[in-house]
Amino acid sequence: MSYNYLKAARKIICIGRNYAAHIKELNNSTPKQPFFFLKPTSSIVTPLSSSLVKTTRPANSTFNGLNEDGTNPGPIFIPRGVKVHHEIELALIVSKHLSNVTKMKPEEVYDSISGVALALDLTARNVQDEAKKKGLPWTISKGFDTFMPISAIVSREKFSSYKSNLQDIFRVKCSVNGQLRQDGGTNLMLHPLHKILQHISTMISLEPGDIILTGTPAGVGELKPGDRVHCELLQNNDNIVDMNFECENRPGPYEFRET
């Protein structure tokens, strides 16, 4: 399976509050339109495996660019003083330019993506909460290095028989230290995939290689140094891709303190 697609990513757009149960667990309001934010591409980290070793980084560096094959294998870094939450999501990989799309049908999603991937939208929850209370942007809470763990791509040919109902065939799972925490079908999304693509395109042009995270189901929880994370993407209950990460203390001087 390939990670080369990551080299073409110019932006990562994340849909928030797209599962009712997740909205309820965080006591948030339900948006009438798809609500989104951005993550930097420097937050990308890819899984370790028997054939991949940690990327060699300069001392105290937590990102040194993607490798030639698109990988950036390493751990999830937990910054000091930060309460990090996992949010498992289906990722869409955009395959063509989309701008000012007035209407999109469900079956048109297939031709607009090159495939899907499994991703974690990691969130510095206490950093985000403080920013919200002060009415400040909360980009940093989503954008730390390694806060975008992502799998190899699953090519769209894998699900070519389901062009009209992609919304209904996927399921995402996240386990921490062997305990299942998140498990949700994409059929539970409040805003469907075609609406997400169409809506974003009216404000921000989508380009080939862009990554769109489509929201997380209920069950978000904290990650701590030493934790082992296992995530799965299923198609009609069959595993099509998974990923594993270990959590470590983040090197460097950063430490979050409430002000």
Curated annotation (Swiss-Prot):
PANTHER family referenced in this protein's UniProt entry, alphabetically: ACYLPYRUVASE (PTHR11820), ACYLPYRUVASE FAHD1, MITOCHONDRIAL (PTHR11820:SF7)
Positions bound to Mg(2+): E87, E89, D121
Cofactor(s) this protein cannot do without: Mg(2+); Mn(2+)
Protein name: Oxaloacetate tautomerase FMP41, mitochondrial
Subcellular localization: Mitochondrion
Swiss-Prot/TrEMBL catalytic activity: oxaloacetate = enol-oxaloacetate
Cofactor binding note from Swiss-Prot or TrEMBL: Requires a divalent metal cation for activity.
Function: Tautomerase that converts enol-oxaloacetate, a strong inhibitor of succinate dehydrogenase, to the physiological keto form of oxaloacetate.
Note from the entry: Present with 2550 molecules/cell in log phase SD medium.
GO biological process, one term: oxaloacetate metabolic process
GO molecular function: acetylpyruvate hydrolase activity; metal ion binding; oxaloacetate tautomerase activity
Family statement: Belongs to the FAH family.
E.C. numbers: 5.3.2.2
Pfam annotation, one family: FAA_hydrolase
Keywords per UniProt: Isomerase, Magnesium, Metal-binding, Mitochondrion, Stress response
Induction context: In high salinity conditions.
Primary localization: mitochondrion
Gene3D superfamilies: Fumarylacetoacetase-like, C-terminal domain (3.90.850.10)
GO cellular component terms, semicolon-separated: mitochondrion
Gene this protein is translated from: FMP41
Matching InterPro entries: Fumarylacetoacetase-like_C (IPR011234), Fumarylacetoacetase_C_sf (IPR036663)
Family matches, as SUPFAM superfamilies: FAH
